[in-house]
A protein has these predicted regions:
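C-terminal segment of N-terminal export signals and the immediately downstream linker at the start
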Residues: 23-41, 269-272
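Surface-exposed binding/hinge segments that line
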Residues: 88, 119-160
Length: 285
């Protein structure tokens, strides 16, 4: 499979919330447990992006090693022109309300994105159900990159296609289900007991995201142990005040985390900001 170029990710807009992949020991394996407490700024929409990433899935995803793999899709293929694609859907999936994932939910979600002029679905002519568990995509022009486009974190699949639900009412198929939330202020979610990603992702038992506008106050909250991870532009307020992991680096940081929070090891020469799925791929030491 082709690796997804980091610059392409940034150009797609997905990098705005990409939050995973830096070095830990190969021997350090993920384990379940704990609540991730994350402080984010009010500006930039990070609360919503991380929350949506926890609650929703896409058809495909970019794995930590940079390869494309299925998420709600288990496979895909196109004709020679790359104008017609067949995407086969996973069958062992249910929404947080207990209802099974249906092809109609996928079609309604993608049509909702397309109706809003989403450029990632530019050139999409039709979506139709095929054989009960697959969807046919018909494009205006051939596009061999369609499976990568479907991995974009904005193209979430929601129950009944309600892709613009408020934080409190989001109903997805992701690892975490909403417990309570208020747009622009806070978000709490709990790990689903059974999920098709069990054993490979979703290591926290619960998530607590809180908006703190002032960067100095976010740093103080991290320093004093009130949160585990804070979105920070610089390490000011942390230097000499404890031991922290700076992500992607101290000189060019987006996040700071306590030493008890483990980030996936860096693979090859990929950059650190390669995936938004902090809630899936980080864990507590």
């Amino acid at each position: 499979m082709k690796r997804l170029d980091r610059r392409a990710l940034f150009a797609s807009g997905a990098a705005a919330a990409l939050l995973a992949a830096t070095g830990t020991s190969l021997a350090q394996q993920p384990r379940r447990g704990g609540t991730l407490r994350l402080a984010v700024p009010r500006d930039g929409g990070l609360l919503e992006r991380v929350a949506r990433g926890a609650v929703y899935d896409q058809l495909t995803e970019v794995a930590p090693d940079g390869l494309l793999r299925g998420e709600l899709a288990t496979g895909w293929h196109s004709d020679d022109s790359a104008r017609r694609w067949i995407v086969k859907l996973r069958q062992d999936v249910s929404f947080h309300n207990g209802l099974p994932l249906r092809a109609s939910d996928v079609i309604a979600s993608l049509e909702a994105h397309a109706s809003r002029g989403d450029l990632r679905l530019e050139g999409l002519r039709a979506l139709t159900l095929k054989d009960g568990d697959a969807i046919e995509f018909v494009l205006d022009e051939g596009n061999p990159h369609l499976p990568y486009r479907l991995a974009d974190t904005g193209l979430v699949i929601a129950a009944d296609g309600d892709v613009q639900a408020s934080l409190a009412t989001m109903t997805g198929t992701g690892l975490y289900a909403v417990e309570r939330a208020q747009d622009g202020r806070h978000f709490r979610a709990r790990r689903r007991e059974q999920h098709y990603k069990d054993g490979s992702a979703g290591w926290f038992d619960a998530l607590d995201l809180i908006v703190i506008s002032d960067a100095a106050v976010r740093a103080e909250a991290l320093r004093d142990g009130f949160v585990d991870v804070a979105s920070l532009p610089t390490p000011e307020g942390l230097r000499g005040r404890g031991s922290f992991n700076y992500h992607p680096s101290e000189g060019d940081m987006a996040l700071a985390a306590g030493q008890h929070v483990v980030m996936p090891r860096r693979i090859s020469n990929r950059g650190s900001l390669d995936d938004h799925r902090i809630t899936e791929r980080w864990w507590m030491a």
